[in-house]
Design a protein with these regions (language model features):
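Subset of outer-membrane beta-barrel
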Residues: 22-210
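Bacterial Sec-dependent N-terminal signal peptides
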Residues: 1-25, 31
Length: 210
C-alpha cells in the first residue's frame, strides 16, 4: 500500500508539469532509442541500425510524413557509446519540411557491482524550409491575376543548432532514464521573428521480470 501511494505521488508530480507538443512522436518508443534518450547510444553489444516511418492521416491529401534513421555502436574499451541520427518531417504535401542531422555520445560510469549510470549529450543541426511552389492561394486562381506567390517570409529556409542530453541509471533488473531535447531552445522562425522550440522532456523506466 505504501508503494502504491508513492507511485501516485510521482504521477501527480509529473502531471503538474505542463507539456508542449512540437516534436514527432513514434508509437514504438524503444524502436527509436536515440530519439527517446541519447544515453541509449551503445546499449547494444552489436552495431545497431534503426529506421522509423510515420504517416499520419494517410487517407487525407497532404498528410504528415516523418521518417528517421539512426546508427549507434558500443565502444567497450572506452566505456562509451556513439550514435548518429538523421530525421526528416514533411507537412502539407512537402511544402514545409524539417531535417535534422546529429550525433550523440554516451559514457558509462560503474557506481558499484550492481549499478551503473550513463550520462550522454547530443548535438544536431536542423534545417527548416518551405517550398512556396507547392502552395496555392485563392488569389492565384482568379482570372487575370499574377500567379507569382507573395508571402511574408524573410527566408525560405533557416538553420539552427540543437542540443540534447540524457542519463540512464540501471542495474541487473531495472532501468530509469531521463532526457531533455532542445535545451538551447533554438529559433526556427521563417518570418524573422521569434519562434523558439520548447524543450521536450522524456522519462522512461522498466523492470525485468524473472
Amino acid at each position: 500500500m505504501r508503494l502504491l501511494k508513492k507511485i501516485w505521488v510521482l504521477v501527480i508530480l509529473f502531471g503538474a508539469f505542463s507539456a508542449v507538443a512540437q516534436d514527432v512522436q513514434y508509437s514504438q518508443f524503444y524502436a527509436s532509442p536515440l530519439y527517446l534518450n541519447p544515453a541509449l547510444a551503445g546499449t547494444s553489444d552489436q552495431h545497431r541500425v534503426v529506421g522509423n516511418f510515420r504517416d499520419q492521416w494517410p487517407a487525407i491529401p497532404g498528410s504528415y510524413i516523418s521518417y528517421s534513421i539512426s546508427y549507434d555502436v558500443n565502444i567497450s574499451e572506452a566505456h562509451s557509446g556513439l550514435g548518429f541520427t538523421v530525421q526528416r518531417d514533411q507537412a502539407g504535401s512537402g511544402a514545409l519540411s524539417t531535417t535534422t542531422v546529429g550525433g550523440v555520445y554516451a559514457y558509462e560510469i560503474k557506481l558499484n557491482r550492481k549499478l551503473a549510470f550513463r550520462p550522454a549529450i547530443g548535438l544536431a543541426y536542423g534545417n527548416r524550409a518551405v517550398d512556396m511552389t507547392r502552395l496555392k492561394f485563392g488569389d492565384q486562381l482568379l482570372t487575370g491575376n499574377d500567379i507569382s506567390v507573395q508571402s511574408n517570409l524573410i527566408n525560405d529556409r533557416v538553420g539552427y543548432m540543437d542540443i540534447s542530453a540524457g542519463g540512464i541509471l540501471y542495474g541487473n533488473e531495472f532501468w530509469f532514464g531521463y532526457s531533455i531535447y532542445h535545451i538551447n531552445r533554438p529559433n526556427n522562425s521563417l518570418l524573422g521573428d521569434e519562434n523558439y522550440i520548447d524543450a521536450r522532456h522524456n522519462i522512461h523506466t522498466g523492470y525485468r521480470l524473472p
